[in-house]
C-alpha cells in the first residue's frame, strides 16, 4: 500500500489565540483541538507535576498566575530594553528577566526554577497545533506555513521561524497575516475581475492594514502598515485599570499587587468586552475578589468606548498610510475586509465605515479563522497541490520596512524601499571615506528615518583587505537580498580584489544561534516525553480509581448482595478502603505504583468473583480492563484475563 501523501499545515500563531488549518480534497478544514475548539489559547502553564498548553493552561491561570505564560508574541524577537516590553511588564503576572539583553520568562516547573526564551514558549503552542493536525490527519506532520503580522520586523520573523524549528516543523514560508486573510477572502471570488481590497486586521495583540490587488488568482500586496503592539489586550488593560480604580474608590483597597485577583479581574474584563460587542451594558460579578470583598459592578458600551477612544482612533492612521503608499484613493477600494476578533467591536466598525464615507464593510469571512485558512492554502501551493482551485495562485508580498546601510555621518542610505515586492535583490556601489582605508564596516538597518540612530540595527560585518588607495577610489558593491519569508541577506564585494563577505540577518544579537535552536529542539523532545509520562501516570491513577469504585458498586448491587459471603465482602471492602486511603496520600505516585495497587486489588477480587460466576473474567465497566469471555453474566467488576 502506498504511504499517505505528505501534507503541510497552515498555522496562525496569534498573541492570544492560535488556529490551524489544512487544505485537502479541494477545500480548507480548520481543525478543532482536543477540547473541540477551533481556536486554542496561546497559553503555556507550568505546575509542580506537568506542563499544560492551550485551554488547560488558560483555565487554571487564576490559580497559578505567576507560572502561566501568555503574550509570547509580544516578546518574540524584541530586546528586553524595548519600551513596549517594559510597558507590558506592568501587566504580566509572570516574571520576565534579561539574559544578554534578550527577554526570558522565569517560571517554577516541577519544583525547579526554569527560564525560557519567547521562541520556546511559542514553540510549545506550535507543537500543540501540530498535534491537533496530526490527530485529525492520522499521520505525522512536518511542514507548515506560519503567519506573522505584516509589520513584524526581520528579527521577529526569524524568531518565529526558530520557534517552528524548535517545535519540529520545517517552516516552508513565513507569510503576513493580512495577506493570508486576503487569500481566504479572494479564493472563491476568482471571476470577479481586478479588485482593490483593504484588509483591516485587528487581533489580540497586533494590528495590520494591507492594501492588495486581487485578479485571477494573483494576490499583489500594494502597501502595508500597522502597529505590532495594538490589539484586544490593550482594550482589556484599559478596563482592568478602570475597575481597579473603582475597587480602590469603593472599598479603599489596592488589588494591584495581588496576581490572582488581577487575573480574575482580567478574565472578567475580557468577558465584559466581548459582551459589549452585542449588548450596550455588561455586568461583572466576582465573588471574594480581594481580601474577602465581593466585586459587583457594570459598564456601558459608551463608557468602554470612552476609555479606549484614543486607541480606537489610532487604528485609522495606518489605514491612511497604507492608502497613501499604495497610491490609491479611498474611493478606489472595492472591498474593506475585517479580520481578527477585535474587529467585532462596534465602535471600530463605525470609525472605519465613517472613514470610507459610510461604505458597507465586508464581514463574509470568519475573523478568527481567516488567517489560518489562507496559510493552509499557501501551504498546499508550496507543497505542489494539483487542485485546480490553487493551481495558478500567486502571492506577491512586500517588505514592510525600508532596508539600508549607514554611510558617512550616520546617514541611512536605503537600498530596498518599504513596500517593495519580495523576493527582491538590489545592488549599489559604495566607496571608502578616507585615504588608504583597509576595510569598511557594513552596518545594516531597517526603518524610515533619515539618520541610522533613529532606525533599528539588524547586524554589522567587516569587509577587510582593501588595497591601499586614495579615498573614493575603491569600489565596494553591496547587495541586499530579501527572500520570500522577508528575511534579509547582505553581501559586500571589493571589485578590485573580488574579496567578499556576507551576513544573513539571523544570528545577529537578539537572535538564537544554530546551537541554541538545536538545544531547544532537544529540550522540547524531553518535555514531550515528560508530558507523555504524566499522561500515562494520570491514566493509571484514573484506571485504579475507576476500578475501586466499580468493585465497591458491584458489592452493593441487588443481584450480588446475597451471593457474596460476608467474610469476602468485608475483605474486598477493607482492601478498597485501603486503596482509596493510599490514593488520597499518593496523588503524585508513579504509574507503576498505581498499577501495583490495582494488581493487588485484582488478586483479592478475582477468586471471589470467579467463584461467583464460575469464570475467570467478568464483564463490566469499560474503563476497567478487557471484556471476559461471552456467556458470563454482565454484572460485577471487570477482571482482566491473563493468558
Swiss-Prot record:
The protein's matches in Gene3D superfamilies, at most eight in alphabetical order, are given as: 1.20.1270.10, 3.30.30.30, 3.30.420.40, Actin, Chain A, domain 4, Substrate Binding Domain Of DNAk, Chain A, domain 1
List the molecular function annotations (GO) for this entry: ATP binding; ATP hydrolysis activity; ATP-dependent protein folding chaperone; heat shock protein binding; protein folding chaperone
Family membership noted in the UniProt record:
Belongs to the heat shock protein 70 family.
PROSITE patterns from the entry? HSP70_1, HSP70_2, HSP70_3
This chain's source organism reads Sus scrofa
Q: Detail which positions bind ATP.
A: 14-17, 73, 204-206, 270-277, 341-344
> What does the protein in this record do?
Molecular chaperone implicated in a wide variety of cellular processes, including protection of the proteome from stress, folding and transport of newly synthesized polypeptides, activation of proteolysis of misfolded proteins and the formation and dissociation of protein complexes. Plays a pivotal role in the protein quality control system, ensuring the correct folding of proteins, the re-folding of misfolded proteins and controlling the targeting of proteins for subsequent degradation. This is achieved through cycles of ATP binding, ATP hydrolysis and ADP release, mediated by co-chaperones.
Instruction: Specify the superkingdom.
Output: Eukaryota
Residue positions of the PTM N6,N6,N6-trimethyllysine? Answer: 563
Alphabetized UniProt keyword annotations: ATP-binding, Methylation, Nucleotide-binding, Stress response
InterPro entries, per the entry? ATPase_NBD (IPR043129), Heat_shock_70_CS (IPR018181), HSP70_C_sf (IPR029048), HSP70_peptide-bd_sf (IPR029047), Hsp_70_fam (IPR013126)
NCBIfam families for the chain: PRK00290.1
Outline the segment boundaries, as ranges, of region: Substrate-binding domain (SBD): 396-511
Region entry Nucleotide-binding domain (NBD), spans: 3-388
Gene Ontology CC, one term? plasma membrane
**CDD domains the UniProt entry points to:** ASKHA_NBD_HSP70_HSPA1 (cd10233)
Which segments carry the region annotation Disordered? Answer: 620-643
The identity of this protein, by name, is Heat shock 70 kDa protein 6
Q: What does its UniProt record remark on the domains?
A: The N-terminal nucleotide binding domain (NBD) (also known as the ATPase domain) is responsible for binding and hydrolyzing ATP. The C-terminal substrate-binding domain (SBD) (also known as peptide-binding domain) binds to the client/substrate proteins. The two domains are allosterically coupled so that, when ATP is bound to the NBD, the SBD binds relatively weakly to clients. When ADP is bound in the NBD, a conformational change enhances the affinity of the SBD for client proteins.
What is any one GO biological process for this UniProt entry?
chaperone cofactor-dependent protein refolding
Question: What does the entry say induces or represses the expression of this protein?
Answer: By heat shock.
- The gene designation is HSPA6
ATP-binding as UniProt keyword: yes
Amino acid at each position: 500500500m502506498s504511504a499517505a501523501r505528505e501534507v503541510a499545515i497552515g498555522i496562525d500563531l496569534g498573541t492570544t489565540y492560535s488556529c490551524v488549518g489544512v487544505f485537502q480534497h479541494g477545500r480548507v478544514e480548520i481543525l478543532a483541538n482536543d477540547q473541540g475548539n477551533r481556536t486554542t489559547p496561546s497559553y503555556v502553564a507550568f505546575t509542580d507535576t506537568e506542563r499544560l498548553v492551550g485551554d488547560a493552561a488558560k483555565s487554571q491561570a487564576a490559580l497559578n498566575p505567576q507560572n502561566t505564560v501568555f503574550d509570547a508574541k509580544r516578546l518574540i524577537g524584541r530586546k528586553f530594553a524595548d519600551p513596549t516590553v517594559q510597558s507590558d511588564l506592568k501587566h504580566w503576572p509572570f516574571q520576565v528577566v534579561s539574559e544578554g539583553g534578550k527577554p526570558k520568562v522565569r517560571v517554577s516547573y516541577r519544583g525547579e526554577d526554569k527560564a525560557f526564551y519567547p521562541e520556546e514558549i511559542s514553540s510549545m503552542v506550535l507543537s500543540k497545533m501540530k498535534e491537533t493536525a496530526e490527530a485529525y490527519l492520522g499521520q505525522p506532520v512536518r511542514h507548515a506555513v506560519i503567519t506573522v503580522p505584516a509589520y513584524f520586523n526581520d528579527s521577529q520573523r526569524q524568531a518565529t521561524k526558530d520557534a517552528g524549528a524548535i517545535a519540529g516543523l520545517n517552516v516552508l514560508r513565513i507569510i503576513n497575516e493580512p495577506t493570508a486573510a486576503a487569500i481566504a477572502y479572494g479564493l472563491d471570488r476568482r471571476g470577479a475581475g481586478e479588485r482593490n481590497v483593504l484588509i483591516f486586521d485587528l487581533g489580540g495583540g497586533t494590528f495590520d492594514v494591507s492594501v492588495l490587488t486581487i485578479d485571477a488568482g494573483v494576490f499583489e500586496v500594494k502597501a502595508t502598515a500597522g502597529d505590532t503592539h495594538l490589539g484586544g489586550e490593550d482594550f482589556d488593560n484599559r478596563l482592568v485599570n478602570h475597575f481597579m480604580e473603582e475597587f480602590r474608590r469603593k472599598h479603599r483597597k489596592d488589588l494591584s499587587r495581588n496576581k490572582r485577583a488581577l487575573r480574575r479581574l482580567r478574565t472578567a474584563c475580557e468577558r465584559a468586552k466581548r459582551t459589549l460587542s452585542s449588548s450596550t451594558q455588561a455586568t461583572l460579578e466576582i465573588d471574594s475578589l480581594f481580601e474577602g470583598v465581593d466585586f459587583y459592578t457594570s459598564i456601558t458600551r459608551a463608557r468602554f468606548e470612552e476609555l479606549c477612544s484614543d486607541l480606537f482612533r489610532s487604528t485609522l492612521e495606518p489605514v491612511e498610510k497604507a492608502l497613501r503608499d499604495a497610491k490609491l484613493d479611498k474611493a478606489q477600494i472595492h472591498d474593506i475586509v475585517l479580520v481578527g476578533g477585535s474587529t467585532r467591536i462596534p465602535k471600530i466598525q463605525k470609525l472605519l465605515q465613517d472613514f470610507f464615507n459610510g461604505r458597507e464593510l465586508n464581514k463574509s469571512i470568519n475573523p478568527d479563522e481567516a488567517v489560518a485558512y489562507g496559510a493552509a492554502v499557501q501551504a498546499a501551493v508550496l507543497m505542489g497541490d494539483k487542485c485546480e482551485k490553487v493551481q495558478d495562485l500567486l502571492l506577491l508580498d512586500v517588505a514592510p520596512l525600508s532596508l539600508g546601510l549607514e554611510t558617512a555621518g550616520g546617514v541611512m542610505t536605503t537600498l530596498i524601499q518599504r513596500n517593495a515586492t519580495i523576493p527582491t535583490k538590489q545592488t549599489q556601489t559604495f566607496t571608502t571615506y578616507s585615504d588608504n582605508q583597509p576595510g569598511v564596516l557594513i552596518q545594516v538597518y531597517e526603518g524610515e528615518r533619515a539618520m541610522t540612530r533613529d532606525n533599528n540595527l539588524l547586524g554589522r560585518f567587516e569587509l577587510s583587505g582593501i588595497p591601499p588607495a586614495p579615498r573614493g577610489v575603491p569600489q565596494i558593491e553591496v547587495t541586499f537580498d530579501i527572500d520570500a519569508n522577508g528575511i534579509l541577506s547582505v553581501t559586500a564585494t571589493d571589485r578590485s580584489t573580488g574579496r567578499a563577505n556576507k551576513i544573513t540577518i539571523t544570528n545577529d544579537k537578539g537572535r538564537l544561534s544554530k546551537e541554541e535552536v538545536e538545544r531547544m529542539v532537544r529540550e522540547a523532545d524531553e518535555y514531550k516525553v515528560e508530558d507523555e509520562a504524566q499522561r500515562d501516570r494520570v491514566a493509571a491513577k484514573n484506571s485504579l480509581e475507576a476500578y475501586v469504585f466499580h468493585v465497591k458498586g458491584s458489592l452493593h448491587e441487588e443481584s450480588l448482595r446475597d451471593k457474596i459471603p460476608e467474610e469476602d465482602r468485608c475483605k474486598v471492602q477493607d482492601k478498597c478502603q485501603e486503596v482509596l486511603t493510599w490514593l488520597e496520600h499518593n496523588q503524585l505516585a508513579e504509574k507503576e505504583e498505581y498499577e501495583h495497587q490495582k494488581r493487588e486489588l485484582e488478586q483479592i477480587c478475582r477468586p471471589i468473583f470467579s467463584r461467583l460466576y464460575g469464570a475467570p473474567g467478568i464483564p463490566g465497566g469499560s474503563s476497567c480492563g478487557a471484556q471476559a469471555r461471552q456467556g458470563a453474566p454482565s454484572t460485577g467488576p471487570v477482571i482482566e484475563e491473563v493468558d
